[in-house]
Amino acid sequence: MAKAATPKETAAVKKPAAPKKAATAKTTAVVATGAVGRVTQVIGAVVDVAFEEGQLPQILNALETDNKGNRLVLEVAQHLGENAVRTIAMDSTEGLVRGQSVTDTGGPISVPVGKETLGRIMNVIGEPVDEAGPVETSSRRAIHQDAPAYVEQSTEAQILVTGIKVVDLLAPYAKGGKIGLFGGAGVGKTVLIMELINNVAKAHGGYSVFAGVGERTREGNDLYHEMIESGVNKHGGGEGSKAALVYGQMNEPPGARARVALTGLTIAEHFRDEGQDVLFFVDNIFRFTQAGSEVSALLGRIPSAVGYQPTLATDMGQMQERITTTTKGSITSVQAIYVPADDLTDPAPATSFAHLDATTVLSRSIAEKGIYPAVDPLDSTSRMLDPMIVGEEHYEVSRKVQSTLQRYKALQDIIAILGMDELSEEDKVAVARARKIERFLSQPFFVAEVFTGSPGKLVALEDTIKGFKGLVNGEYDHLPEAAFYMVGSIDEAIEKAKKLAAEAA
């Protein structure tokens, strides 16, 4: 890679071009910061810029231009030859004209980092968008960083308790790990991520970073106001704020959506390197891939499977490998991942599976039964579900719950054709228990209180294990199914059963 320019070389830019021969010898060695180029072509989010010989910016450098009074940042994606570069715009390119001057900043996009970002909303290039004045910070950091080396990484296994029964019991989250929430449209990914922010971020003493990648602006706005109301953030940031928000929503050009996750991650990395335990929420990783696929064709790359960019695995890997726990501090990341047409084998969700410590799969068939969170207990996995980590009792209970549910699933065809009466007594008991377990896996959420009217519940891990242990051992076979629906602990289910019995009497 060519070296950065010295002040002398930068000054030399303004002189007339040297004779052809001398310039050719220099092109490989000189990369001038502050070099000025001209726009030669604009195709949507992709802009071509030509530079003088010997002034070619490096790949991933940020270029800046003025677009009708607004600062427009372009990121170099390709060298085209003939001293021309192809760039991706971080904002709308409407109004750009050929021949317009573009300046090389000499480095990648850099964003403000540090405590001053807490309580603020920023866009992909680190500009505040919450109308609360500039982000007063002296430290900035480039959004493109190398992943920490093996020696720096920490491998401690510890559980992060969420207070959500189905998660804590069957697919527990790792502290300092990567968690994926998979689901199609409208099965509750965003509600679940908001509940995790509510349960984990509020109880968590450290800092949180939320990256809104290509999702609804309304949800981003709601989250901002909820955080202020609940005391996680102060209006306009400042002392007492605990979360930084970075948004590149649905209405943004693909350049912004393809980079905004890296902007959020850069802020989280800075806190981690200062020794903090950081929570990093991303909604939605699929939009990061989708934005990459949008610009990929414009960059002239041949599409890969299902029309995705050929660099899909590389793009995902470069980002995911940076989300890691080091000996200095930890990043626990929760990522919502949209599943197109409910197809988990689609390349976008399938590529992210390999990077995760725990996967929570949301299922439409469970949502149709009115069971929320609509987590599929048989499809969700976690590397933390190991007797050496969670303990023998937790492991045994969770495996018994899964085997009971699996047995019910296997019997469903028989029930549909022949009915319940044709089952053996043993199978009837298993089906009755499985139906109670299914309902007991539901739980009222704090963030859904406004829709459901029922107050949210946070269930301690001991209570979750106790309740399900009793269920699989048949201690609650006498209670009706309805008693287990939308309650917190098993004691609440018993209370509800008494109420139902009193009403029926």
UniProtKB/Swiss-Prot annotation:
It comes from the Bacteria. GO terms for molecular function: ATP binding; ATP hydrolysis activity; proton-transporting ATP synthase activity, rotational mechanism. Its EC number is 7.1.2.2. GO terms for cellular component: plasma membrane; proton-transporting ATP synthase complex. The keyword Protease does not apply. ATP binds at G183, G184, A185, G186, V187, G188, K189, T190. Keywords: ATP synthesis, ATP-binding, Cell inner membrane, Cell membrane, CF(1), Hydrogen ion transport, Ion transport, Membrane, Nucleotide-binding, Translocase, Transport. Gene3D superfamilies: 2.40.10.170, Bovine Mitochondrial F1-atpase, Atp Synthase Beta Chain, Chain D, domain 3, P-loop containing nucleotide triphosphate hydrolases. It is a peripheral membrane protein. It catalyses: ATP + H2O + 4 H(+)(in) = ADP + phosphate + 5 H(+)(out). Its main location: membrane. Signal peptide: none annotated. It is found in: Cell inner membrane. Residues 1-25 are annotated as: Disordered. Produces ATP from ADP in the presence of a proton gradient across the membrane. The catalytic sites are hosted primarily by the beta subunits. Belongs to the ATPase alpha/beta chains family. F-type ATPases have 2 components, CF(1) - the catalytic core - and CF(0) - the membrane proton channel. CF(1) has five subunits: alpha(3), beta(3), gamma(1), delta(1), epsilon(1). CF(0) has three main subunits: a(1), b(2) and c(9-12). The alpha and beta chains form an alternating ring which encloses part of the gamma chain. CF(1) is attached to CF(0) by a central stalk formed by the gamma and epsilon chains, while a peripheral stalk is formed by the delta and b chains. This is ATP synthase subunit beta.
